[in-house]
């Protein structure tokens, strides 16, 4: 499948689907079809952007996630916390308060993805400087930070794959660092 992940975070509740086609017209990669009055996701086309979840008036689509209680099943329950997590709360809660709440929920360690941002930014800047020094430098260069954008390019615009910045995202750098521990 062109290196595209086979795991999909969007699923359907058939009993809620009314076949209204709103999700079909909203899907940026045309990954939804209606058969027998029910929507079906074409997994090989889905980029997991979540747009169908957002627009479905019947809440027939949902994001697959693990129950928070499953954290207890792991010896090492590590969370990679994106910067946006900390902005979701009232300013009276510090990062330390939020991290402590995550630990209280059962996570054994909290890693902040933002800690890898400076290193990735430097690597990206160095790559771009070197790249644009070349006479026939490929343009535009597209950020590789968003998994949905990467899947969109792989599925819908494969001719743009070579335009993706070949530097891993801060989230991927954080995940690799944690795996190496």
Residue map of PLM features:
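Iron-sulfur cluster-binding cysteine motifs and their immediate structural context
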Residues: 2-14, 18-43, 47, 51-66
């Amino acid at each position: 499948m062109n290196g595209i992940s086979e795991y999909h975070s969007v699923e359907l509740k058939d009993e809620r689907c009314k076949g209204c086609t709103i999700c079909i017209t909203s899907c940026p990669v045309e990954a939804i079809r209606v058969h027998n009055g029910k929507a079906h996701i074409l997994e090989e086309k889905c980029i997991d952007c979540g747009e169908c979840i957002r627009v479905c008036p019947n809440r027939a689509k949902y994001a697959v996630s693990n129950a928070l209680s499953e954290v207890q099943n792991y010896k090492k329950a590590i969370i990679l916390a994106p910067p946006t997590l900390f902005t979701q709360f009232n300013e009276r809660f510090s990062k330390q308060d939020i991290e402590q709440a995550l630990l209280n929920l059962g996570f054994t360690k909290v890693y902040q993805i933002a800690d890898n941002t400076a290193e990735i930014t430097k690597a990206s800047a160095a790559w771009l400087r070197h790249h644009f020094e070349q006479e026939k430098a490929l343009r535009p260069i597209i950020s590789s930070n968003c998994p949905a954008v990467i899947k969109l390019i792989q599925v819908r615009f494969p001719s743009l794959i070579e335009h993706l910045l070949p530097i891993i995202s801060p989230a991927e750098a954080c995940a690799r660092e944690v795996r190496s521990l």
